[in-house]
């Protein structure tokens, strides 16, 4: 199993989205290398064209470049630890390389494409033989953590070139900061938001979820309550309905015949599911001891109770049933009232109808955490030419960013490009000339969520990454498919099993 498998679903989603993202070619849609469902129906729409705004120029070398006496410096760009090796993407990448080389005679940029399934082993071999590349990408957190500790701190290069980091939101910038420094610069980002179906709220007289962070929620009795997971539970139960029209709070409700669910968490990775309750990581400060953040333990128990006791969240068998999208994001069936998800779900949410909207992520213990995914290009510590590599990096993130974001279906991290992205979405039409997206989606909610990105990120490094993902998947499957478990015991067993795997990896 690939050690970045926690992001496999998202990467497969983003790769396959290229085919179905005839829907949103603004940045061609949304789904590029970080975690999404394995299979989702292809929207029946015709191809469209659009592009993000031209990138804001940043500091660039002054004066014309000349070829150094020894010839141009070779910089190798390695792909594809995630997205990037679809034929349509490769042609764009080769054009980007050609364009760069035509403008930079002092540097020869070489593109190395390795298919996703073999990329990790290939990069490991190259690094082991001291023949590694200079730049790797696009790569998400999971892919980069497979090579933890090998990424260059860009702080001095940013200062030296006066590279303008203010063009990105502070939350996005901080996302790439770690104990090792600024190990990345924002490129394509995927913030979280709450998708919801207004008609389901209207049907039973409920107010819609808040659209501004910090707002309270008005309950049916007029009381104002915090927008948190307790509120989500209450609303979720009222919005869960069986075939006889009873909701999950009523006597006679039949949990075996539910036709509409109230809430669906982002369950691609149980670390990510828990991150909505608080940022954290499984590795303690010493890098070798397993820790289960308190917020994560609470999140898993809340999720389990929501499936098996309160019945407002789908169990695994329901989630994987054909009636609820066969393991894909079930909100997109139009049978779920609310769902937390990343922005890449915009690609396929069209199947949920033409009247959905976006609300804010709820808080836990008074704090909002909106799980976050992001892709970028990184420079390896082993590069012999950091200055030249950084010049290439600036080009990929600057002049070439429009072409690459379009090819990778990425939402731009550069704030000046984000508004155009949503404008183009609103202009998309299906084969019959009807708008694909609802006319008044509150896209600002998605951008506002960036400031609440989970840091440390849920995909952060842990020992025995490969084996650990297997263990996490095993427990996730067990919890989703088995009622009556003692979750305190389950979480303790998970911790013990992870620790055993970590200890044996040294």
What does each model-found stretch correspond to?
Residues 73, 102, 106-108, 180, ...:
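Extracytoplasmic/periplasmic substrate-recognition and gating elements
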Residues 95-168, 182-184, 199-205, 209, ...:
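Extracytoplasmic "Venus flytrap"/periplasmic binding protein-like
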Residues 126, 133-134, 161-201, 260-262, ...:
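A structural signal for short loop-to-beta-strand junctions that line the ligand-binding cleft
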Residues 359, 407-478:
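Long, aromatic- and glycine/proline-rich binding clefts that accommodate carbohydrate-like moieties
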Residues 233-237, 271-274, 285-321, 350-352, ...:
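Glycine-centered hinge/linker elements that transmit conformational signals in sensory
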